[in-house]
Amino acid sequence: MNQPLQHAASLLPEDPAALRQLIRAGRYRGHTSGLARGHVQANIVILTRDWAYDFLQFCALNRKACPLIDVTDPGDPVFRNLGRDVDIRTDVPMYRVYRDGNAYHETTGITELWRDDFVAFAIGCSFSFEQALLAANVPLKHINLGRNVAMYRTAIETRPAGRLSGKLVVSMRPLKAADAILATEITARYPDVHGAPVHIGDPRLIGIEDIESPDYGDAVPLDADEIPVFWACGVTPQAVIREARPEICITHAPGCMLVTDLDNNRL
């Protein structure tokens, strides 16, 4: 029996469709940071039809955290605008399933859970702008260490929509001062994948008390000559929806994105 592959860009296909096939076959279950470089990655939220409008409105009001790039018709598991044969039931390395907002369980496929009233949302991910940062020689420590990006809940309020409200989640990348300035200039060009940072510097100012203990992802060390740079994160919907307690909600596991065929340069 084939064993799942470990995260290593050199061992995994660069073609996003080939990578999705590997994921669909259960051969890769890890995070997707640094994989299929140059292609858009997406956070995933799946809700029942009766919650879909509230979430659509939430995305419109909180575009920094939830830049919507595609949505499916009710009951249709295929994203028609993200590439060829993109099946949301099988093409994410790891899913989280929440019921009534309670503790999640993780699974590598949701075909057996799929319902005719499910609507799937694809939300832009900061992994997509990492290629532009690397091309500009901005070092990304989490990729160099083979880790998931660090993500934190903050004290920053999102704008409420219907039954949905809550705090912003951010991703953090340690950068030297000059690189932080360059990264801000570069990521501002990518509003469909979170755009420019929401905060630079002291994490306590946005409600993060212990930067060494992320709420999601992996801890990434901060050297003395580095400052933390924070971007709005597509894990925000998971925190918000969990508080709203819908009957069922399915998301990607943090860091385990849907890799699309879309070119980052078209964003």
Swiss-Prot record:
SUPFAM superfamilies: PSTPO5379-like. Pfam families: D-Glu_cyclase. InterPro entries: D-Glu_cyclase (IPR009906), Putative_hydro-lyase (IPR038021), UPF0317 (IPR016938). The keyword Acetylation does not apply. Coiled coil: none annotated. Gene3D superfamilies: PSTPO5379-like (3.40.1640.10), PSTPO5379-like domain (3.30.2040.10). It is an enzyme of class 4 (lyase). One of its GO terms (molecular function) is lyase activity. Keywords: Lyase. Its EC number is 4.2.1.-. Belongs to the D-glutamate cyclase family. This is Putative hydro-lyase RALTA_B1245. It comes from Cupriavidus taiwanensis (strain DSM 17343 / BCRC 17206 / CCUG 44338 / CIP 107171 / LMG 19424 / R1). The lineage of its organism: Bacteria, Pseudomonadati, Pseudomonadota, Betaproteobacteria, Burkholderiales.
